Amino acid sequence: MSKSRRVFLSMQDDDDFWGNGDRFEEEKSCLAAKAKQRSCPVVEMEEDDEEMEEKYFFKQSHLVRQRLEQMKEREKVDEEKEGVERREENGFSGKPWKFRVDSDEHEMKSDDVVTEDRSIMGTKTFNSDFDDKSAIKSSLSMSLESNDVFYANYRNFFRGRPEVHFLIRCLFEKNPETFDNQFIDLYEKTRKRLEMYPNPHINQILRRTLSSSNATETRVRSKHAVVVSNFREPDRRLGRYSKYYYHHNVGPEVYSRKVFVGGLPACVTEDDILGFFSRYGRLQVDWPSKHYGGSKSDSDPSLCSEIITPPAPLSHLSMASPPFGQINPFMSGYVAPAETRGGFLRASGFSEGGGFGGGFGGGIGGGGGFNSGSGSGNGTKSDGSTSEKRQSHLGYVFLLFEKERSVRDLVAECFEEEEGLFITLESSLEPIRVQIRPWLLADAEFLMDFNVPINTKLVAFIGGVPRPLKAVELAHFFEQTYGNVVCVGIDIDNKFKYPRGSGRVAFSNYDAYVQAITDRYIVLDHEDIHKRVEIKPYFFHNQSCEECSGRYHRQHAPFFCPSLECFQYYCEPCWHKMHAHPSRFHHMPVVKGV
């Protein structure tokens, strides 16, 4: 997709973005109503007056600028003439200079005797001439300085905003390519038109943030840490309209169907969460260690009708936790099989009754064990059992919606604060304010420059990326540390398109790539994020060996040597061949998937 196409698509609103045509029909009806109103002569007169007023305003502003330029040129000519006169006077003797001084004194004395009527008619003294010239110079300098500051602020504002160029090219055929005064006047004229005929979506793009463009960022750079104290956060809801977002999501979805909800107290139960958020659509609540202590349930709500038969356990690891995809949380009343539910308990000496079994011979309560309840021998019904502890959330949950439209409805009802998006959860006890953190799909990719090609040999893998971190923020960190960043991507899962905790960074400079791989770790320190991430070479699924180019049985390269002596990908035969020498025997490989 071309650059202009992406920028054009980024200007579309949500309804046009989904392509349902409702927004277009509303706009057509609005345009028809406006056309009927314009047929009225009174409205035409008002519009003519507005257009005349606008033309007069721009004409007057243009005349003022021309007048300032003419006054500046005249001032230069006067200064040159005064310099020539001074040089000529310095070349003569002292008598002419004395004569001029005497004449000036005589004029000043005569001016003191002049009446007020004569002064009103236009006679001016030497002092008044000097004061007028100084006042004109001061006012001219102030106006010129303000004019220069005006253009300088606009030039700083235009940096990194290609949507401004595209918008003005769409409105006008002839426009300059550089940020000169004519371009800025054209932009100001467009902005005035949009103020007279408002368009909320275009006005969102053309927001004037001149004050923020002059703000300086305090950066502290070290070898393994980046601290940015004044990083400008993009808008959470209108990320596509921000200056940091040039990527357009190709597809109908805008948000991930998986939403993070934080700030939940222990008194809020799963039923309370389901009862409140079910108004937005069908969903399921999930959190880590909800099922069998550690296995995450990321099943799709659309698969709730499927019956999954678990395979027989093959080892003690499969007894401890079922295989991936075995549990479907959307199946009501799902109970794990007996061999899976009790295999680990029997192997570790526990019995399903709740107490210690064979290992201790029932010496510690064979029937009730450690149960603090009624002592009935059923661990699932007791208050202190492990199954009850697993069912309580950890202060946060994930909402797994069936449709993406539900997430957009949820975000629309949230209120925004400095920390993020919040909503008031109506529980059985009292209303609770909880944080809603949706994932915008456009945040998963960020391009620094469209014109720079991506070299696949200069791509680094970033492990341990915090899930709230966006691609633009990750690009900002690496740009401040190493520089020459071309593209940054956040890895997302295929089912919910939610971040997986890793990312990719593509460099345009070999030295920057080598420095990043050599450092191996970097600490991301920004606001509430403080985490050390790992930097490794990126392994593609068909990564070829750089030593033999896949000649050995067409094997891929699962090894990478980070030593500067090698610093390339190897297949297994080439690794043993190249590192058999004693000088390279101590090299430690970076293995794919480890």
From Swiss-Prot:
Keyword Metal-binding in annotation: no
Every RRM domain range: 458-540
Bias-annotated ranges (Gly residues): 367-378
Amino acid composition bias (Basic and acidic residues), ranges on this chain: 72-90
Gene3D superfamilies registered for this protein in UniProt: 3.30.70.330, Cytoplasmic polyadenylation element-binding protein, ZZ domain
Keywords: RNA-binding
Disordered as annotated region, ranges: 72-91, 367-388
Gene Ontology BP annotations: negative regulation of cytoplasmic translation
Top-rank taxon: Eukaryota
Entry annotated with the keyword Membrane: no
Pfam families, per database record: CEBP_ZZ, RRM_7
GO CC terms, sorted: cytoplasm; nucleus
GO molecular function, one term: translation factor activity, RNA binding
Function: Cytoplasmic polyadenylation element binding protein that binds to and regulates the translation of specific mRNAs.
Matching PANTHER family: CYTOPLASMIC POLYADENYLATION ELEMENT BINDING PROTEIN CPEB (PTHR12566), TRANSLATIONAL REGULATOR ORB2 (PTHR12566:SF12)
Name of this protein: Cytoplasmic polyadenylation element-binding protein 2
UniProt source species: Caenorhabditis japonica
